[in-house]
């Protein structure tokens, strides 16, 4: 058993005539066991290999309102500039959490409807200011409720 662990392969030197022949032909050796494990380096571009000129989609303008090729290039440049403005991730690799940016009241009400405790309390305040409307709402709600002893009272 111990002899089996001591066995190793020693690659002999390549003969001179083979090395000259391979050089003349332009032969490249395939990957070895050591080189297969190495990961290839990826280009530092934003990972958008489709940005190459021959791989871009063809722009066809059918109507006056369609985007032209120049407008598309401007939009792409704006997107790249916006990405450049963002802060790069920290060097130590830690994720930093920040408070979200507060929105103005106009943005909050732009078509979104969500119920929250504040809105409910605001509605209650409005209802307290107009008790007449509140009483009429209670009467409507009471008429829709089921009650078994109310027939004698109503008649």
Swiss-Prot record:
Keywords: Acetylation, Phosphoprotein
Keyword Cytoplasm among UniProt keywords: no
Composition skew (Acidic residues), residue ranges: 43-56
Modified residues (N6-acetyllysine): 108
Biased composition (Polar residues): 128-147
Renumbered residue ranges of the record's region Disordered: 24-63, 80-155
Modified residues (Phosphoserine): 50, 130, 147, 150
InterPro entries xref list: DUF4604, KIAA1143-like
Protein's name in the database: Uncharacterized protein KIAA1143 homolog
Originating species: Rattus norvegicus (Rat)
């Amino acid at each position: 058993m111990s002899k089996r662990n001591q066995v190793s392969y020693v690659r002999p030197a390549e003969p001179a005539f083979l090395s000259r022949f391979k050089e003349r032909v332009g032969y490249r050796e395939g990957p070895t066991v050591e080189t297969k494990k190495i990961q290839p380096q990826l280009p530092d571009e934003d990972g958008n290999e489709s940005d190459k000129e021959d791989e871009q989609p063809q722009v066809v303008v059918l109507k006056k309102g369609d985007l032209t090729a120049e407008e598309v290039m401007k939009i792409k440049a704006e997107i790249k500039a916006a990405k450049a403005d963002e802060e790069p991730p920290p060097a130590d690799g830690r994720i930093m959490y920040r408070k979200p940016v507060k929105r103005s009241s106009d943005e909050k009400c732009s078509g979104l409807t969500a119920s929250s405790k504040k809105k409910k309390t605001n509605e209650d305040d409005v209802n307290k200011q107009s008790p007449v409307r509140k009483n009429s709402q209670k009467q409507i709600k009471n008429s829709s409720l089921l009650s078994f002893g109310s027939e004698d009272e109503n008649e």
